[in-house]
Design a protein with these regions (language model features):
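C-terminal alpha-helix
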Residues: 175-190
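Residue-level preference for the first positions of well-ordered beta-strands
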Residues: 33, 68-70, 164-165
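Conserved catalytic-core segment of NTP-binding enzymes
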Residues: 49-148, 156-157
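N-terminal phosphate/diphosphate-binding loop that engages ATP/GTP or pyrophosphate donors
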Residues: 1-29
Length: 190
């Protein structure tokens, strides 16, 4: 990108990416993890070169290598605005029981349609009761709902400790399995 306070700069719009997955991915039980980074500091300049690299890498993984790709993106609309998710088969939007979250999900669905994302699903998150479930379900009737993740102090504690929450609580496992089962019913394979 550019440096703070400077203009322009040139970056390659078709960077070579074919060696990135094999060179930088961490592999565990056949699953490769590739951490793509984030914006390092406020006012750091244009993020266009990084977005171009990401789009090229995704195109390479999906089209040339025919790999299944899961993106865990930061909350917000930036990736949709930059087109990083263009052409994806499916997008899962995590929705909390509140009007701002519901409105954001509606906006995400519109942006996803602009990018020809084929399916947009939702998962209710931090749900504490039936009223929370109804708020999400009734607020987003046009979405395919995959399931709910309960508000759970085990997740908060795991985050504080820098641990994965999945193995800490059986309820978490059940809820994740339910989401996966519903995703498969909708035609998205594991």
């Amino acid at each position: 990108g550019t440096t703070k306070g400077q203009f322009g700069g040139v970056f390659k719009i078709n960077p070579q990416v074919d060696d990135i997955p094999d060179q930088f991915a961490i592999s565990h039980e056949g699953v490769k993890l590739l951490i793509l980074g984030s914006i390092p500091e406020g006012g750091g300049g244009c993020f266009c070169p990084e977005s171009t690299l990401l789009k090229s890498l995704l195109r390479h993984l999906i089209i040339k290598r025919d790999e299944a790709v899961i993106l865990d993106m930061e909350a917000g609309l930036e990736h949709l605005g930059r087109g990083s998710t263009a052409g994806m088969d499916a997008l899962i939007v995590v929705v909390e029981p509140g009007q701002r979250s519901i409105q954001t999900a509606q906006h995400i669905k519109k942006l996803a349609a602009d990018l020809q994302v084929k399916k947009v699903f939702i998962v209710g998150n931090k749900v504490q009761n039936e009223s929370d479930k109804e708020l999400i379900k009734n607020g987003l009737p046009e979405f395919d709902l995959l399931g709910y993740m309960s508000f759970n102090t085990a997740i908060i504690q795991a985050d504080k400790e820098g641990r994965a929450p999945y193995d800490l609580d059986e309820r978490i496992k059940r809820e994740v399995e339910e989401v996966l089962k519903n995703l498969e019913k909708k035609g998205v394979e594991r």
